[in-house]
Amino acid sequence: MGQKVNPIGLRLGINRNWASRWFPNYQTAPLNISEDHKIRKFLKKELYYAGVSEIIIERTAKKLRVTVVAARPGIIIGKKGADIEKLKEALKKIVDKEISINIKEVKRPQANAQLAAENVTMQLERRVAFRRAMKKVMQAAMKAGAKGIKIKVSGRLAGAEMARTEWYMEGRVPLHTLRAKIDYGFAEAMTTYGIIGAKVWIFKGEVLQKGIQPEKKEEAPARDKEGRGTRRRGRQ
């Protein structure tokens, strides 16, 4: 089950919190969900070059607070906060409430799964070889302190006629362990051959109660797998 399900959704209430935080009722829930989707879609498009990893939306009766977690917060804020005011005016067209926007910086962007997935897709759009792009992102994440990382890409890789899936893994990524802090990200690359999807899982350690010592396990060596049957790749 841990291999198939979204690792963030599986750990909600255990070591992850919700990205939308409000108390719904049967009348307002559909509208709130629709507005949250529109806000996220707008901000991801508008702040693409700021490296947005997460958007947290909190609601009260009359107020809406949006927290944007990004790798380059200066691009969002602008000169003397001018760009923040423009964002507020744009969001008021979507939501008829008093809006406040908070900006948080990602401490280690190389070890953030969403930013890592977007990094892979940006390289693929620049026609970088997919294996090179994956290994480069993996090395950067491990240097930034990740305990393990797994990257999977799917689509017409290297312009092949038949779509396939390939993945690389380094270190430990225990998807079945609920106390494991697993970060997950997904992005798509629009290439001339079609869309290539990239998924990234990053293991950042275990969340334990006080007084409990984690089990010591040896790290697995880096490995890769082609996702079509048992056919092996030829010499590169």
Swiss-Prot record:
<dbReference type="GO" id="GO:0022627">
    <property type="term" value="C:cytosolic small ribosomal subunit"/>
</dbReference>
<dbReference type="InterPro" id="IPR005704">
    <property type="entry name" value="Ribosomal_uS3_bac-typ"/>
</dbReference>
<comment type="similarity">
    <text>Belongs to the universal ribosomal protein uS3 family.</text>
</comment>
<dbReference type="GO" id="GO:0003735">
    <property type="term" value="F:structural constituent of ribosome"/>
</dbReference>
<dbReference type="GO" id="GO:0006412">
    <property type="term" value="P:translation"/>
</dbReference>
<protein>
    <recommendedName>
        <fullName>Small ribosomal subunit protein uS3</fullName>
    </recommendedName>
</protein>
<feature type="region of interest" description="Disordered">
    <location>
        <begin position="213"/>
        <end position="236"/>
    </location>
</feature>
<dbReference type="Pfam" id="PF00189">
    <property type="entry name" value="Ribosomal_S3_C"/>
</dbReference>
<dbReference type="InterPro" id="IPR015946">
    <property type="entry name" value="KH_dom-like_a/b"/>
</dbReference>
<keyword id="KW-0699">rRNA-binding</keyword>
<feature type="compositionally biased region" description="Basic and acidic residues">
    <location>
        <begin position="213"/>
        <end position="229"/>
    </location>
</feature>
<dbReference type="GO" id="GO:0019843">
    <property type="term" value="F:rRNA binding"/>
</dbReference>
<comment type="function">
    <text>Binds the lower part of the 30S subunit head. Binds mRNA in the 70S ribosome, positioning it for translation.</text>
</comment>
<comment type="subunit">
    <text>Part of the 30S ribosomal subunit. Forms a tight complex with proteins S10 and S14.</text>
</comment>
<dbReference type="InterPro" id="IPR018280">
    <property type="entry name" value="Ribosomal_uS3_CS"/>
</dbReference>
<keyword id="KW-0689">Ribosomal protein</keyword>
<dbReference type="InterPro" id="IPR009019">
    <property type="entry name" value="KH_sf_prok-type"/>
</dbReference>
<keyword id="KW-0694">RNA-binding</keyword>
<dbReference type="InterPro" id="IPR004044">
    <property type="entry name" value="KH_dom_type_2"/>
</dbReference>
<keyword id="KW-0687">Ribonucleoprotein</keyword>
<dbReference type="Pfam" id="PF07650">
    <property type="entry name" value="KH_2"/>
</dbReference>
<dbReference type="InterPro" id="IPR036419">
    <property type="entry name" value="Ribosomal_S3_C_sf"/>
</dbReference>
<dbReference type="InterPro" id="IPR004087">
    <property type="entry name" value="KH_dom"/>
</dbReference>
<dbReference type="GO" id="GO:0003729">
    <property type="term" value="F:mRNA binding"/>
</dbReference>
<dbReference type="InterPro" id="IPR001351">
    <property type="entry name" value="Ribosomal_uS3_C"/>
</dbReference>
<feature type="domain" description="KH type-2">
    <location>
        <begin position="39"/>
        <end position="107"/>
    </location>
</feature>
